[in-house]
Amino acid sequence: MEKYIVTGMSCAACQTRVEKAVSKLPGVDNCAVSLLTNTMGVDGSASSAEIIKAVEDAGYGAKLQVADEEDAQSAIQSGVNESILEDHETPVLKKRLISSLGFLLVLMYVSMGHMMWGFPLPGFMDGNHVAMGIVQMLLSGIIMVINQKFFVSGFKSLIHGAPNMDTLVALGSGASFAWSSYVLLAMTGAQLAGDTAQVEAYMHEFYFESAAMIVTLITVGKMLEARSKGKTTDALKGIMKLAPKTAILFENGEEKEVPIEQVKIGDIFVVKPGASIPVDGFVEEGESSVDESALTGESIPVDKTAGDQVSAATVNQAGYIKCRATRVGKDTTLSKIISMVSDAAATKAPIAKIADKVSGVFVPAVIAISLVTMAIWLLVGRELGFALARGIAVLVISCPCALGLATPVSIMVGNGVGARNGILFKTAVSLEETGKAQYVVLDKTGTITEGNPKVKDIVVADGFDEERLIKIAGSLEKYSEHPLAKAVTDYVQGKGVDLSSSELTGFAAVAGNGLKGKLGEIELAGGNRDFIEKYADINEDFANRIDQLSKEGKTALYFCENGRLAGVIAVADPIKEESAQAIKELDNMGIEVVMLTGDNQLVAESIAKQAGIKNVIAGVKPDGKEEVISNLKKRGKVVMVGDGINDAPALTRADMGIAIGAGTDIAIDAADVVLMNSKLSDVSAAIRLSRATLRNIHENLFWAFIYNVIGIPLAAGAWIHLTGWTMNPMFGALAMSLSSFCVVSNALRLNLFDVHSASKDKKIKFNNTNDFIEEESEMKKKMEIEGMMCGHCEATVKKALEEVDGVKSADVNHKKGVAVVKLSKEVSDDILKKAVEDKEYVVKSVESKLF
């Protein structure tokens, strides 16, 4: 996505105009304009020159966000150009406002002070109404020149056929000035004719103060809005300021301070107590505790020793450490966070489309309503001055800005709150949609559990000893990247077993099943029970012993040598301390929690019981996880939470994917939301924040719509006959100036929202059905069978299988040569195979499968 800075936008109508102009270009796939940050993100093959020309043809200005050498270097280091977030608008508006108020006070003194309160006037004006009118015209004209931006932008947009908020202000103020100037000319004629009564009558037809007050009050509102908008990006600006500007490199035995841009991958840098870590890396020497709250929101310092990872912008609290740089510039964790938050602000939430559609026709509709209002009052016999006042009031009270800001300000603040708490939403869509979750599907390892499994039991088969078993296991597992493999290799190395000579040939990893390879002439295999049963026999007594370990939540890894079972290594991964509470919070929100794991049913049920999860789908291979998510999506909104490579397809397939921050880069890339902490409680926090943000957007949209629905008829004088109410255009301008300020202020309330407080959680009722989950939770095996020729064969095989202890049912299809067996407990492949082959059919294969 290329990013551009857009200038000249003043309201939602401008935003819509720019989006339409760029979206029409050939090669533009997507265009999102942010009125909040005055930026535009464009996807596609269109050139930057074409895009900039399209924006300029629409009446606005544009330039690439990284446009010069200095900005480019800054962007490389931080991942985003910080200058675009600086508040350049408020100082300019402040100067305009001070100048306008100075002249406005004099104007109000002249126009109202003498008449209402008897304030003295200069001699040349006392009793000279024409002189008073000329002074008012000059003062009003000066104020309008000071605020000429409204007129330049407004009439320019009108000429381009895309009127905006500035057009409404310019028409309202300009009409007041033009009418008053006409009255002044008429008054001059009356005075020359000696018609004193007519001169007195004309004196009450002046609207010079309204013309000046309108632009001044709108400037007040614009300044309040600009200051509030600046606060919405405080979180992002705060993160940017965390980036250290220098680093201390250790070269040739000496310390040397250099600009952060000069640090390269592989450099050794030192971090002293109290200093910020400059780039990502790992500790080579020393020990310390590091405050990572800037990235994760977690206030408790983390102990670091040799080999541990450190991240840029975290603070070294205690020891002196030497580190080696692994990621610098835009690749650091900090830069990625900044980029994610910035990119999210540049995207558009689906709910914003409502406001966009209205904004596209809002200003032309208001101008039409204003003209109709004037025409109606003239037709019913009211004087031109009264009709004009009603038409001007309609123009200046209408506010498309409130509509345009309703969604993006809430998205920006919500993203900032998330970033401060270690919850990163990649897009506005993910921030809006996460809170709509009906099902939260959790991977087991590293998500519910700590992801740091340890060997707990060694069960040796007959004819083998423990040393031989763990050498077989270590020889295989050292080639695997699975978390369980690391647990085994750590255990083997801890026992002092030398694996340097254990070089395998023909090594292969079968996803979701196991490993195999040859050590010289010896064939080795390791994995789950179904996998090992293809290579070795497992007697029933041994299997029962292992089932008991599985019921305790331990994962059994079987190993065999040359077709003989060598034994089992049982590995346990304890659940995270906060997992049970996190799942309880999700349940209290009305969300169905599902555990989805490749582990066997007994282990999965044990972990689920500890965590308080009612729905378990076990024995699922990596490709099967994606299939489960697809089926579950037919029943409601699905959020998938995972941390591993195997979870990436499921994360992508889900309505929303949430990656645990300590997980793999692949999982993080596939996800829509990233949790910088590895705490499961942050899942409920993300959903809670999403719901709060969406609620805030609804409040903003309601205010923006209801304000215009009530305000425009009031300004038009629709209620005069019922209530006698009329609205002075000045009060209309005041209301307009405050409307956007109210919307932005409401969005800023999100900064006070506690994402971890479950006290106000509401249990949203969904029509969730658990039939699918219960069906998928059953253990199933698929058997390919040869020799079945007819319905009688089907019935024979079905009866044989259903007589096996542990088989709930068997669905047999002789045409496909397949039997699907549903189990109530673990049943070995050999037992099922024997039951069928005793009936003189041939079993080609047996496998656990998800359907």
Please describe what each predicted stretch is.
Residues 1-133, 229, 254-257, 339-347, ...:
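Flexible metal-binding regulatory segments at protein termini and peripheral loops
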Residues 26-43, 48, 205-206, 237-331, ...:
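Conserved cytosolic catalytic loops of P-type ATPases
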Residues 92-246, 357, 458, 724-729, ...:
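Transmembrane helix-loop-helix hairpins at the membrane interface
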Residues 95, 314, 438-481, 511-594, ...:
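ATP-driven catalytic headpiece of P-type ATPases
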Residues 116-130, 159, 178, 417, ...:
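Membrane-embedded alpha-helical bundles of multi-pass transporters
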Residues 196-197, 212-273, 304, 354, ...:
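Juxtamembrane coupling segments of multi-pass membrane pumps/enzymes
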Residues 295, 354, 389, 402-476, ...:
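Conserved catalytic phosphorylation-site environment of P-type ATPases
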Residues 347, 437, 519-521, 553-555, ...:
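Conserved ATP-binding TGD loop and adjacent catalytic N/P-domain core of P-type ATPases
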